[in-house]
Amino acid sequence: MTDIDAEGVSSNRDLWNAWTPHHVASEFYDVEGFVADPASQPFDSIVREVVGDVSGRRLLHLQCHFGLDTLRLALAGARVTGVDFSHEAIAAARVLADRTGLPAVFVESDVRALPDEVPGAAFDVVYTSHGVLSWLPDLRPWAATVAHSLAPGGVFHVIDGHPTQWIFDDEALEPPLRVRYPYFGDGPLRFEEHGSYAAPDADVTTVSYSWAHTFEEIVGSLLAEGLVIE
């Protein structure tokens, strides 16, 4: 990993550590509503259709943030392990699991180093979703983690935006759409963040780094590890 990539990962970890308490308290995530009645906040229909029946299955949730979706998967009957590199997020996830009484294991780890953190683990399902890939500087170790973590016959589900989604000017208020960012990444993009997507008014300023990955890179990294597309 290059020096700028290492700097970016460290800065992003600081960002998620700073964001986590604001997210736990936000209306966006409605944690208190989930604690009061977990069954009232199931996965949306698209996620349920993609992931299918997980009852009794060993499931690994990569980049799980503070575990809300991980616990939704536990509620659906999965035997879940959630992984995130933010110590604040993992601490909050463990508190949330205790408050709801839902069984879950949470591991603090960079997903690219997970084979060292959970040696020999084998999961029926590996899952990751929504805005996760752009936080990773290199998809090859990520794909290796996915392959290492799957049991024979296991399935990997990834739900994320198409890479072309990220090339347009997200600050433009009027049409037409304008290309602002590169599709073919050559190092990270650096942004100063005020608040967050879930808590826009939060009094927190952070710096994020984002890496562009082409569709070919995403699929190719997984195929190179022996996965196949169903």
Placement of each model-derived feature along the sequence:
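Conserved class I S-adenosyl-L-methionine
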Residues: 1-55, 68, 72, 155-196
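A short SAM/SAH-binding and catalytic strip from SAM-dependent methyltransferases
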Residues: 124-140
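A short glycine-rich, Lys/Arg-flanked "PGG" loop and its adjoining helix->strand segment in the class I
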Residues: 140-155
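Short alpha-helix
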Residues: 208-230
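Class I SAM-dependent methyltransferase SAM/SAH-binding core
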Residues: 57-114
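A short acidic, Gly/Pro-enriched loop at the edge of an enzyme's catalytic core
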Residues: 116-126
